[in-house]
């Protein structure tokens, strides 16, 4: 809705619902006539199943979502401002068809909201400064609200993102530079963990809902493009971040105690702690340097070399691996070796034929055929060796793809 030449508003609603069935199905009897499955509690002596029947597990879930938002932008003089606010609610249900009760488990609706705002100030035709700030709540996913055994988390916390960003830009005919700094605090990340407590109706395996899992993501970035010549462009970019966990986490498991008549006579609580404070967030390089040179020797031909260097890449790991049991393990997760790789790109716009615009392109990735660790898992359960000390021999590594290429032809008509 256009309020005035300077102010424009937009409002919207979002309603979604989904019903999902989860099951494992018999697809091949391997020459047999039937199979006996013992997963269904309604058939404790086993159930004869044939092609198309469900085995192992069978449950159904529903997800109901409703949201509304209002956003607007305001442009006046040298200022460009915007803001938005939204609210949503989500509800989950769960039914286990292999349980005797087959009860519909329904969790209370979860409400979230978000608010964002920001603006840009144009100092002149070439320079501008900008700032953004936001607070966003994210509801926990169904698995973190209702566990596979039907356990409902009591008052699950919404995940919260508090972020701000500020920076500046400079743009001229030959030089473009963007500098920005960011700070994002991720609060109350929702995680669950299966543990052997010796408690619970499910046997020795129970669900622990972790609280206090917080992350801090801070850093700065620089991007630039410089026209060295009408046929040569230089691209440079640097990104440096410090992403780590803030504080430790804990989780409680509470189990009701019953007498022979089924009456509640007490409660047993088991507390679990997780040493996370100061550990680096894994599975993503926190520092990168990019340099690129683009050459356009003739009209329609574009050749680019792009070299990327990655550093401070910590291996992937899960907070539940730092459960406090005896000596507290606060050793940093394994950091993979730094690495760089060169990619080459070429494109040529062919002459138009019969009204068809055609572009030939080719890409050579990892042109120097470097060997590097692209991903890793810290203290791998299955592929690590020796004592678990967060070292290279404890990690499971995935090497980057060797030199490879592709060639393509795009046609527009």
Predicted regions and their residues:
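Residues on the lipid-exposed face of transmembrane beta-strands in outer-membrane beta-barrel proteins
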Residues: 1-5, 11, 68-74, 117-121, ...
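Transmembrane beta-barrel strands of outer-membrane/channel proteins
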Residues: 11-17, 83-89, 129-135, 168, ...
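Surface-exposed loop/turn segments flanking beta-strands in extracellular/periplasmic regions
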Residues: 23-54, 149-155, 193-209, 255-273, ...
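C-terminal beta-signal and adjacent terminal beta-strands/loops
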Residues: 234, 300, 309-321, 348-413
């Amino acid at each position: 809705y256009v309020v005035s030449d300077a102010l424009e508003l937009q409002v919207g609603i979002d309603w979604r619902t989904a019903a999902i069935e989860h099951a494992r199905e018999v697809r091949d009897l391997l020459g047999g006539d039937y199979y006996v499955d013992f997963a269904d509690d309604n058939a404790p002596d086993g159930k004869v199943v044939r092609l198309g029947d469900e085995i192992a597990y069978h449950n159904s879930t529903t997800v109901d979502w409703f949201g509304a938002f209002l956003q607007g932008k305001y442009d006046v003089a040298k200022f460009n401002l915007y803001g938005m606010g939204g609210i949503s609610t989500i509800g989950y249900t769960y039914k286990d068809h292999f349980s005797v009760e087959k009860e519909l488990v329904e969790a209370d609706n979860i409400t979230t909201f978000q608010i964002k705002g920001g603006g840009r100030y144009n100092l002149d035709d070439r320079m501008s400064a900008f700032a953004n700030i936001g607070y966003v709540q994210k509801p926990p996913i169904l698995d973190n609200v209702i566990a596979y055994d039907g356990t409902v988390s009591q008052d699950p916390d919404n995940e919260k993102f508090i972020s701000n960003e500020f920076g500046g830009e400079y743009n001229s005919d030959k030089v473009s530079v963007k500098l920005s700094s960011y700070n994002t605090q991720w609060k109350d990340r929702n995680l669950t963990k299966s543990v052997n407590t010796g408690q619970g109706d499910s046997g020795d395996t129970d669900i622990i809902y972790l609280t206090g899992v917080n992350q801090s993501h801070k850093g700065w970035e620089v991007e630039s493009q410089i026209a060295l010549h009408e046929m040569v462009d230089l691209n440079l970019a640097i990104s440096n971040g410090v992403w780590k966990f803030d504080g430790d986490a804990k989780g409680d498991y509470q189990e009701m105690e019953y007498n022979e008549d089924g009456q509640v006579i007490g409660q047993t609580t088991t507390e679990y702690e997780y040493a996370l404070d100061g550990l680096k967030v894994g599975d993503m390089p926190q520092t990168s340097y990019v340099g690129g040179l683009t050459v356009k020797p003739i009209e329609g031909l574009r050749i680019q070399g792009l070299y990327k260097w990655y550093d401070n890449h910590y291996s992937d790991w899960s907070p539940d691996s730092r459960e406090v049991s005896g000596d507290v393990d606060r050793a940093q997760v394994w950091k993979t070796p730094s690495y760089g790789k060169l990619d080459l790109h070429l494109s040529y716009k062919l002459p138009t034929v019969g009204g068809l615009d055609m572009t030939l392109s080719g890409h050579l990735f990892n042109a120097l055929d470097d060997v590097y660790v692209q991903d890793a898992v810290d203290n791998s359960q299955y592929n690590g060796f020796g004592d678990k000390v967060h070292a290279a021999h404890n990690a499971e590594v995935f090497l980057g793809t060797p030199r490879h290429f592709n060639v393509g032809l795009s046609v527009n008509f």
